Design a protein with these regions (language model features):
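Secondary-structure capping and domain/repeat boundary segments
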Residues: 1-177
Length: 177
């Protein structure tokens, strides 16, 4: 907007409306607008980037950290993945890769990963034991029982040997005796 033929000492005319720019926030004028006209002046809009489109310049916002950990104390399954300087409202960065741990299956993250960043967050991997290495949490599998009986009625040649809670694919327990 250009204002011409202004007399020295009159109030500097205000910009009509609000300057807008996609992905940015209007921060003000450079130089600062003088209260009165003292000569020719050009005022340049200054902008602050607003990646999360919340109306606050990114350089004025709190930044957050998202961390993915293996969830295992005293052992390193994988190095933490850490994402820093995240703005509120942006998509939560995903874990890169697939968590793997020998003898276990990955069950998910605790707490569940939020869709958007709202603050600092740590997500710990959760694991289910997988003794038979079939890719299924042992607690979710059907368990089997193997029983050895003497096959004699009315006489006990040997006591029944019962092996319970066996997983598919594990070695059959041997008869003892």
């Amino acid at each position: 907007q250009v204002y011409g033929n202004l007399l020295s000492g009159v109030a500097t005319p205000a910009f009509e409306g609000t300057p807008t720019r996609t992905g940015y926030v209007f921060k003000g004028w450079n130089p600062e607008v003088a209260a009165t006209v003292t000569g020719n002046a050009t005022y340049i809009a200054t902008w602050g980037e607003d990646k999360n489109n919340n109306g606050i310049a990114d350089d004025e916002e709190t930044k957050y950290t998202v961390r993915y950990t293996d969830g295992v104390d005293e052992e390193v399954i994988f190095a933490d993945q850490v994402y820093r300087n995240l703005l509120s409202g942006v998509d939560t960065p995903a874990f890169k890769g697939t968590p793997k741990r020998e003898g276990y299956v990955f069950k998910g993250w605790n707490p569940a990963v939020a869709e958007k960043v709202t603050g600092d967050a740590t997500y710990a991997a959760t694991w289910g034991e997988d003794k038979n290495n079939n890719g299924i949490d042992d607690n979710e599998e059907t368990k089997y029982t193997v029983t050895y009986k003497d096959g004699v009625d009315g006489e006990e040649v040997f006591a029944d040997q019962v092996y319970g809670n066996l997983l598919s694919g594990v070695a059959t327990p041997a008869f003892e005796g």
